[in-house]
Each structure stands twice: as C-alpha cells, then as structure tokens.
C-alpha cells in the first residue's frame, strides 16, 4: 500500500528504532516515545514505520512552519501515496470576544486562505476514501469540523448513462455547498451552460465537466481549471461536498427548533437573575440569527450553534478530523514537548474566552460546545500514539510503554562541545568568536533573556561591522522565516533572539550558539531549553556552544551531561564504523509554503498576553500578580518563551510598584 522512496537506507540508530517502534505497534502498545536527537533523521524513521505497518497516519506538529516542512518531507518519501496538509485556514484570525471592564464587544474578524481550504477538503476526501494516507496537521486538527457521516451521505455519484437532468444536478450541488457562478477560477463553484455543467471542487485542482443528452448523463471529463481543456474521460465520478460543514433542510429545521428551546430556557434564567440588559441583548441577537437561518440557511457565527445541527448533547465533543480516520490510524506527535502542552491547554483557553460572551448575553451556552477537544477526549478518539522529540516531557516519558532512543546520526556528526565561560567581558569574547565563525563562512546564533537585550546586542554587533538581525515576537511567521533565510544565505552573520527554538528549522550553516546569562535559573534556561538550544549546532561539523555563566546551575549540569553522553555514543559509533563526520548539506531555500503564512497561525490555546494585562484594571495588585505568575508558568510550559518573558517583566514591574508604595 505505502511505497517509500528514498536514495538512502536506514543507518545508525534508525534500523533499531524502526524495528522497536514497529514491534511496539504490532504488540498493541498504546504509547511509545521516539527520543531522537537533532539531525538523527526522525522524519525518515517515522516514514519507515508508516510504510512497514501500512496504516493511515496523522502527524501533529506544533505550528504551521514545522508542519509545512514535515509535509514536504513526507511528500518526497511517499510520491505515489496521498500526503495531505491540514492546518488552520485563517490567514488572519481575531476571535469574537467581550471585555466587560471596557464594555467592549469585539466581532470575529478573519481572512480565509482558499488554498488551505482546498487542502483541508482534499484531506477529508482522502481520509474517507483510501488508506494510504499521511496527514500532516497543526494542533488545529482538534477543532470542530463537519460530521463525517454527512460527508459520506451527501456526495453525488454519477455515471455515464445515469438518468438525471441538469437542474436536478444543480440543486444537489447547491445542497452540498457549491455555489453557482460564471467565474470558473473559483473553487467550490459550478456553472451551467446549456446541457453542460462544469464543477470546480475544493478538494482537487481539476474541474469536472458533465455533459447531458436530455435527462441523461452523456459524458464525464476532467478538465483544466483555467483553460478548460479536456484532461481525461471518465465512466463515473463521485463529487464530494465543497465545504466542511453541510446540512440538510431537515437538520436545519430541527436545529432552529432546538435553538429556540435553548433561547427560551436561557432567557428565563436571565430574567430570574434580574439581568435585563443581557436578556434583551441575547433575545435580539439570537432571534436575528434564527431569522437568517430560516431564510438564508446561514448566519454569521453559525459555528456557535454547531451542537444543535449535529444533534449533540451539552458537553459532548464535536466532530474533528480524528473522526474521519479509520479506527486503526497511528498518531505521531512531533516536538511532543511543545505539542502536548498545546493540546492540553486549547480547551481551557477557548472556554475562558467564551465565558464572557455567554455571561453577558452575546451567545447562548451552546457556544461552549463549538470548541476544541479536551486532552482526555483527544486520547479517547485516538489509538496508538508515538511521541517524537529530542527532549520528551515528563508526561510522554511516564505514559510510554517504551522509549526508543535514536542518538546516532547517519552523517557521523557529534553533539557540539559545550564550554562555560565567565560573564566578565562576555560581549567582547562573543565578538571574537563570531569573527572566527564569519571567517570560516559560517553563522552564529545568540540567545539572550530579554527582547531589549537582543535589540541592543544586535545593534552593537552591527556597529562593529558584524551583520546582525534579531528575532522578536512582533515579527509574524513569514518575517521570522525571512530572517532565517538571510542567515542561511549569508546575508547576515548572526541572529540574536530570546526564543530561537520557535521555528525548529534546520540551520546547517550555524556552527556557534552563544547562551548569554546561562546561569540565570528559570524557564528560558531549563534543562529542556538548553538541550534544544545546544541542538541548533548539531548539523555542522564545527559546532560549538558557549554558555556565559559564573556558576553551574543544576539545569546546566544536566544539559551538559546529557550532551556529553550523546557525544560519546556517536564518537564510539564513528570509530567502530570508520565514519568521518560531515556537515549536513541542505538547499539554501527554506521550503515553506509562504502563501499559507501571511499571518501567524492564531495561538488559540490560551489568553493573549494583552488580555492578561487588561486584568490589572479589575484585580487587586496581589491578585494580578498571582494571575501573572500562573500565566507565566503556563506559557513557559508551552515553550511560548516570548510571552513568558513579557509576563515575567510585568510581574517584576508590579512587585517594584508595591515595594515603592510600602516604602521598601
């Protein structure tokens, strides 16, 4: 079923890792972990496991950038099978919200990317119709999508010779989300011309031309979407829905009645509580929505009524991509130390935002049920899971029936040497090291604790003739990737930043990583973070890490010991097999789907830092500090280090304010 194509055979630790993981799957192990160091070929190992067990697979990545990279790698490994891409279809997303302290209602505002919509629909079709499928997805895959049973029931089967007339086909197309138009370049549309219907699905590039003779299908052809030339003649075809959420007239009527019932119950509650403003607001808004649903079959924010359309009970999980798979599909959670905390936090973040909308009469309580899955629901809807990371979290390690190590790199590259140097004169020392790197035609990364330090250090390096840029949270995904492209091309010599783990992209030109203030204990200098940062130089033969510190913290000690352990294993392997290490060679263009990444994927799994700062107006200083501290640790656990740093700075500022007021 799966046919893996590669010029390489598994080497190093890959063969034993593949064997153990496949054996674990065949023995029915529910949870396994692949602990693979940077550059050890974890994606190739995953591809081999998929090919060996011949089962559909879902690979979940923590962000769009990494998902795009994985998608391309799997496409190359499986050119004859279906590899699909399923991420949030928003280029820009501002969720609906209400801020009581300002009496400010924010309407939902979003730009939808048609290319991603097409890829999502292609994913749903592939997963429902074949088994040789690998889907690469972001954490958006646990958000609601349409009922898979409706997707199956409402497709249109046509064959040459079928008795159906043009208008009946047009009516059936409209029922599954296609719109009639003359613009043939639009996906999800169809056009009528005499006895011919041309259909442009959202799930494929080719159009479909159906020609009639009276009330009989005379011919079916695939056509080029733009010049409309014939590509292939077909005897039969299945036309799948154009949109994720589809409904029947019967379901619509049932949903409207159910919404009315819930509205009456909620209005009764608000009346008893004496909430007259909320009563009138909810009544007016919901009745307007009902009128639109009855006349147009649609209303703004229709997703907030999804429970009524699906016939779900309050609290029941929504349908998601997971429900489209066969029951035996495998899940790989890539960069699990980041992705698992995201999956855990998304439900709470969504519910906290909707709480005000429901309490203040903007939405019915059923809006809570248009939501992502809880982590427990996610585990119930999945079967066997393989966590993949260079630094798995405690959860993954504790729950896994086996942890498979992949330490040896096929390239022979060893983990970099780690030096600890004093902070006195650290900037001058750093400059000298960067100059050496520059002379070799290589690059450097410098990680610091604050955005301000990153900015000042980058400016200082530039003044000294070193081409430097800094990464910061105001840059969106494309701008961040552009900075890294410049680094790889040699347009800049060094990149300075607070969180250099965010992209997770391969940077083989980087031979030096400098960690400033390495002994300042906290989330930015934890064992996991330090190991991840050290791994940034693991693709270059001259890789070196310098930690500037005046003492060795426990986190530093453990990170250095683990790095040295991995070095020993690789060096012994190289000696035994006569391998000479070589740097990774990778095409200069960092292949990322830029058309998908105009804006950063909305980080919908928690409150934004900005909204947290708004709480200062309604909380006492002590309560506000407690919230800041809690959110800081949550952001750190999810490796959102820039958010965590901003919250930390605000926490320090409030503490200083309190001290001044108390005269301390």
Curated annotation (Swiss-Prot):
Sequence motif Beta-hairpin, residues: 89-112
Listed SUPFAM superfamilies: C-terminal UvrC-binding domain of UvrB, P-loop containing nucleoside triphosphate hydrolases
The entry's keywords: ATP-binding, Cytoplasm, DNA damage, DNA excision, DNA repair, Excision nuclease, Helicase, Hydrolase, Nucleotide-binding, SOS response
Gene3D superfamilies: P-loop containing nucleotide triphosphate hydrolases, UVR domain
Localization of this protein: Cytoplasm
SMART domains: DEXDc, HELICc
HAMAP family the UniProt entry points to: UvrB
Alphabetized NCBIfam families for the sequence: PRK05298.1, uvrb
Protein name: UvrABC system protein B
């Amino acid at each position: 079923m799966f046919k893996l194509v590669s010029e390489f055979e598994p080497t190093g630790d890959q063969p034993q890792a593949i064997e153990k993981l496949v054996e674990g799957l065949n023995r029915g192990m529910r949870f396994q972990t692949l602990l693979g160091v940077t550059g050890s070929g974890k994606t190739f190992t995953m591809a081999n496991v998929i090919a060996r067990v011949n089962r559909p697979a879902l690979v979940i990545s923590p962000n769009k950038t990494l998902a795009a990279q994985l998608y391309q790698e799997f496409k190359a490994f499986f050119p004859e099978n279906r590899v699909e891409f399923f991420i949030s279809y928003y280029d820009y997303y501002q969720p609906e919200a209400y801020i009581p302290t300002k009496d400010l209602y924010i309407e939902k505002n979003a730009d939808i990317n048609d290319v991603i919509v097409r890829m999502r629909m292609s994913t749903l079709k592939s997963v429902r119709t074949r088994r040789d499928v690998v889907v690469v997805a972001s954490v958006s895959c646990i958000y609601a999508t349409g009922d898979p049973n409706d997707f199956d029931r409402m497709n249109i089967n046509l064959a040459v010779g079928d008795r159906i007339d043009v208008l009946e086909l047009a009516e059936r197309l409209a029922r599954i989300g296609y719109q009639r138009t003359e613009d043939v370049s639009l996906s999800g549309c169809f056009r009528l011309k005499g006895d011919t219907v041309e259909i442009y699905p959202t799930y494929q590039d080719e159009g479909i031309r159906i020609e009639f003779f009276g009330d009989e299908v005379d011919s079916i052809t695939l056509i080029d979407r733009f010049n409309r030339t014939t590509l292939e003649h077909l005897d039969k075809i299945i036309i799948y829905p154009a949109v994720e959420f589809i409904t029947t007239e019967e379901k619509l009527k049932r949903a409207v009645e159910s919404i009315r019932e819930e509205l009456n119950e909620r209005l009764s509650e608000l009346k008893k509580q004496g909430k007259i403003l909320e009563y009138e607001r909810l009544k007016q808004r919901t009745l307007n929505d009902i009128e639109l649903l009855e006349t147009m079959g649609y209303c703004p924010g229709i997703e907030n009524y999804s429970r009524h359309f699906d016939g779900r009970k309050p609290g029941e999980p929504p349908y998601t991509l997971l429900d489209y798979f066969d029951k035996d599909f495998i899940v790989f959670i890539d960069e699990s130390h980041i992705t698992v905390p995201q999956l855990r936090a998304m439900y709470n973040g969504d519910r906290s935002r909707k709480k005000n909308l429901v309490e203040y009469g903007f939405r019915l309580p059923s809006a809570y049920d248009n939501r992502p899955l809880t982590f427990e629901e996610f585990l119930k809807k999945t079967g066997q899971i393989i966590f993949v990371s260079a630094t798995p979290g405690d959860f993954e390690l504790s729950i896994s029936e086996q942890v498979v190590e992949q330490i040896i790199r096929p390239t022979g590259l060893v983990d970099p040497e780690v030096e600890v140097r004093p902070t006195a004169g650290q900037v001058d020392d750093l400059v000298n090291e960067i100059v050496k790197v520059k002379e070799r035609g290589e690059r450097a990364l410098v990680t610091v604790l604050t955005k301000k330090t990153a900015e000042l250090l980058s400016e200082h390096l530039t003044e000294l003739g070193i081409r430097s840029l800094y990464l910061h949270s105001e840059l969106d995904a494309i701008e961040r990737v552009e900075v890294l492209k410049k680094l790889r091309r040699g347009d800049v010599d060094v990149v300075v930043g607070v969180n250099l783990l965010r992209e997770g992209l391969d940077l083989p030109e980087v031979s030096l990583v400098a960690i400033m203030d390495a002994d300042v204990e906290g989330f930015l200098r934890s064992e996991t973070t330090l190991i991840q940062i050290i791994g940034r130089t693991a693709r270059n033969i001259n890789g070196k890490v310098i930690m500037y510190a005046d003492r060795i913290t426990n986190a530093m000690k453990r990170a250095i010991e683990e790095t040295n352990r991995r070095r020993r294993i690789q060096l012994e392997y190289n000696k035994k097999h006569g391998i000479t290490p070589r740097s990774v060679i990778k095409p200069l263009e960092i292949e990322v789907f830029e058309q998908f990444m105009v804006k950063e994927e909305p980080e919908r799994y928690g409150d934004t830092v900005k909204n947290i700062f708004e709480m200062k107006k309604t909380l006492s200083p002590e309560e506000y500090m407690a919230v800041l501290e809690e959110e800081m640790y949550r952001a750190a656990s999810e490796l959102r280090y820039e958010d965590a740093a901003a919250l930390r700075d605000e926490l320090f500022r409030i503490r200083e304010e309190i001290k001044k007021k108390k005269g301390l």
